[in-house]
């Protein structure tokens, strides 16, 4: 049995606490929001973020981050990506040498273009940082529906520790050394999911969605491979797998925000309606900046940025994508 501290009491942190508790681990959840912790203590259910999912009485809750870090062997960092650095700064004075921190948020820091694990490593250099991601909505994990994810780390030993920590009959965990590919797939798919949602909001059909998913993973792969990621990762669970579920699921906040924008909502109106952090909005500018840095064309992500930040109508953005210059589907293919 391990002692695990979960930093962040949102839907994902709450769902993962259930997985860990069911595996027999000691689990403590930290949140900076006192009212959230009081509600969890009283109800043993996150009635705002994960209603209907009852947590075991063995799970404890606190607003004392020092206590959570010092009292637990392994930490799971589950705050939204936009709060990663500020939370890591709070954690840094208390993290022990070699303590494992599992990052489960998906995003790219806009001003530095760093992945989540890179941000954590820069603020807490003594930590052993891992990541875990894949097609995994908290709502389904909380209902104990079969889910498969990937644990990535710099060393095989750390990845396997994380694998053993979480894996059970309804939560399968693979391992991977390609942390960069995992994080790029997990963050950039949120931007493509916004586009998929916009297509839904405009009333377009399955043909449009299939094209966005297929061309979306092509865009993500070109950039990620240019940055050093492996193609196998992008066409695995943390790439195409995560992209499919985020573009298709009713649980996807990125798809929902995009759908509202397609229906005529502004970006601000859509995010207020979703009522949770829409990671794709924060990753969109960073994705575009990475494309420029590595001299890679990403037409879908370019158009999403124009819709989000330049008030371009979503329908016009789709039309421009359809009317781009004629080209071969894959530049690596040629006629003999």
From Swiss-Prot:
Gene Ontology CC annotations of this record: cytosol
EC number: 1.1.1.94
Gene Ontology molecular functions: glycerol-3-phosphate dehydrogenase [NAD(P)+] activity; NAD binding
Active site: 189
InterPro entries attached to this UniProt entry: 6-PGluconate_DH-like_C_sf (IPR008927), 6PGD_dom2 (IPR013328), G3P_DH_NAD-dep (IPR006168), G3P_DH_NAD-dep_C (IPR006109), G3P_DH_NAD-dep_N (IPR011128), NAD(P)-bd_dom_sf (IPR036291)
Catalytic activity: sn-glycerol 3-phosphate + NAD(+) = dihydroxyacetone phosphate + NADH + H(+); sn-glycerol 3-phosphate + NADP(+) = dihydroxyacetone phosphate + NADPH + H(+)
GO biological process, alphabetically ordered: carbohydrate metabolic process; glycerol-3-phosphate biosynthetic process; glycerol-3-phosphate catabolic process; glycerophospholipid metabolic process; phospholipid biosynthetic process
UniProt KW Lipid metabolism keyword: yes
Broad class of where this protein is predominantly found: cytoplasm
Protein keywords: Cytoplasm, Lipid biosynthesis, Lipid metabolism, NAD, NADP, Nucleotide-binding, Oxidoreductase, Phospholipid biosynthesis, Phospholipid metabolism
Subcellular localization, as worded in the UniProt entry: Cytoplasm
DNA damage recorded as keyword: no
Record: residues binding NADPH: 11-12, 106, 138, 253, 277, 279
Metabolic or biological pathway, per its Swiss-Prot or TrEMBL entry: Membrane lipid metabolism; glycerophospholipid metabolism
Enzyme category, top tier: oxidoreductase
Pfam families: NAD_Gly3P_dh_C (PF07479), NAD_Gly3P_dh_N (PF01210)
Sequence positions that bind sn-glycerol 3-phosphate: 106, 134, 136, 189, 242, 252-254
Protein function: Catalyzes the reduction of the glycolytic intermediate dihydroxyacetone phosphate (DHAP) to sn-glycerol 3-phosphate (G3P), the key precursor for phospholipid synthesis.
PANTHER family linked to this entry: GLYCEROL-3-PHOSPHATE DEHYDROGENASE, GLYCEROL-3-PHOSPHATE DEHYDROGENASE [NAD(+)] 2, CHLOROPLASTIC
Family per similarity comment: Belongs to the NAD-dependent glycerol-3-phosphate dehydrogenase family.
Name listed for the protein in its UniProt record: Glycerol-3-phosphate dehydrogenase [NAD(P)+]
UniProt gene name: gpsA
């Amino acid at each position: 049995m391990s002692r695990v501290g979960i930093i962040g009491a949102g839907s994902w942190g709450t769902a993962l606490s259930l997985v860990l508790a069911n595996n027999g681990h000691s689990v403590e959840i930290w949140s900076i929001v006192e009212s959230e912790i009081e509600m969890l203590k009283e109800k043993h259910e996150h009635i705002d973020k994960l209603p209907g999912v009852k947590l075991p009485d063995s799970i404890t809750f606190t607003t004392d981050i020092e206590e959570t870090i010092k009292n637990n062997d392994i930490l799971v960092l589950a705050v939204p990506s936009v709060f990663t650095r500020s939370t890591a700064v709070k954690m840094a004075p208390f993290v022990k040498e070699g303590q494992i921190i599992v990052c489960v948020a998906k995003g790219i820091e806009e001003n530095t273009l760093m992945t989540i694990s890179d941000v954590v490593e820069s603020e807490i250099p003594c930590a052993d940082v891992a990541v875990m991601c894949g097609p995994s909505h908290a709502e389904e994990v909380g209902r104990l529906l079969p889910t498969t994810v990937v644990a990535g780390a710099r060393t095989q030993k750390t990845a396997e520790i994380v694998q053993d920590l979480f894996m059970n009959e309804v939560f399968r965990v693979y391992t991977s050394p390609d942390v960069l590919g995992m994080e790029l797939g997990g963050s950039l798919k949120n931007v493509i999911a916004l586009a998929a949602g916009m297509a839904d909001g405009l009333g377009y059909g399955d043909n449009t969605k299939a094209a966005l998913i297929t061309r979306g993973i092509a865009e993500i792969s070109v950039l990620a491979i240019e940055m050093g990621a492996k193609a196998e990762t992008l066409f695995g669970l943390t790439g195409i797998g995560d992209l499919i579920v985020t573009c298709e699921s009713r649980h996807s906040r990125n798809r929902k925000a995009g759908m509202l924008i397609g229906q005529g909502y502004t970006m601000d109106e859509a995010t207020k309606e979703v009522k949770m952090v829409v990671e794709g909005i924060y990753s969109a500018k960073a994705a575009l900046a990475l494309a420029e840095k590595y001299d890679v064309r990403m037409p879908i992500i370019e158009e999403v940025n124009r819709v989000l930040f330049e008030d371009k109508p979503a329908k016009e953005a789709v039309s421009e994508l359809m009317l781009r210059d004629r080209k071969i589907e894959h530049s690596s293919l040629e006629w003999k």
